[in-house]
């Protein structure tokens, strides 16, 4: 194995995922995973509404909204930047899989769609996270005036949990959908496309701007 390892030119894109449609038990198990992930999304939205309904002083709410408007301007600008990055990444993906790997145009488009979904997922979670944080900030500050330490802890704790659960749920839904509905010979490449898009969005939104 060690002597022939240098001759094995393969990577994650060459992984062939089995056809789960022929294995009813495995298919249903993964479908249950998607259902549980949707429950995670619902949990995140419920916590968002609960945090939003917590009372706070109008002046604190105005400050929180002002911070969000500033963050929204940043998000819109970063969205334009991500579009430019995605165009460059799409060219690289199309060249590698279409020219070097000699995949069909249809298969390359599937991989490109996976990368776009990755960027949109990361961008959507960043938007949700910033909005949730600005809502929680004003409520936490107002709650601190009541001198109730547990309530002060619970608001940012629930806000952070909801953001994390929404992030993981979106990633699991997409990954399980790739396993179930994308042909096995394309699944590995789609995972790479999704990972590139997700990482690209995360790095641009977090490193470039430093909002988090």
Question: What do the predicted segments below correspond to?
Answer:
Residues 1-11:
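N-terminal secretory/membrane targeting signals
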Residues 9-212:
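Hydrophobic, small-residue-rich transmembrane alpha-helices and their short perimembrane loops
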């Amino acid at each position: 194995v060690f002597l022939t390892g240098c001759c094995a030119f393969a990577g994650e894109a060459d992984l062939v995922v089995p056809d789960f449609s022929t294995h009813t038990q495995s298919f249903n198990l993964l479908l249950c995973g998607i259902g549980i992930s949707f429950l995670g999304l619902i949990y995140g939205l419920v916590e968002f509404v609960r945090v939003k309904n917590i009372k706070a002083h109008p002046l604190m709410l105005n400050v929180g909204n002002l911070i969000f408007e500033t963050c929204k301007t940043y998000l819109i600008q970063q969205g334009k930047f991500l579009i430019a990055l995605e165009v460059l990444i799409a060219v690289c993906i199309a060249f590698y899989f279409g020219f070097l790997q000699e995949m069909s145009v249809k298969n390359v488009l599937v991989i490109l769609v996976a990368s776009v979904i990755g960027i949109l997922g990361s961008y959507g979670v960043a938007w949700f996270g910033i909005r949730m944080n600005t809502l929680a900030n004003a409520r936490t500050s107002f709650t601190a005036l009541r001198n109730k330490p547990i309530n002060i802890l619970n608001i940012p704790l629930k806000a952070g949990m909801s953001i994390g659960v929404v992030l993981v749920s979106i990633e699991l839904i997409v990954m399980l959908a790739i396993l179930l509905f994308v042909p096995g010979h394309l699944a590995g490449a789609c995972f790479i496309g999704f990972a590139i898009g997700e990482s690209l969005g995360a790095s641009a939104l977090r490193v470039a701007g430093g909002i988090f």
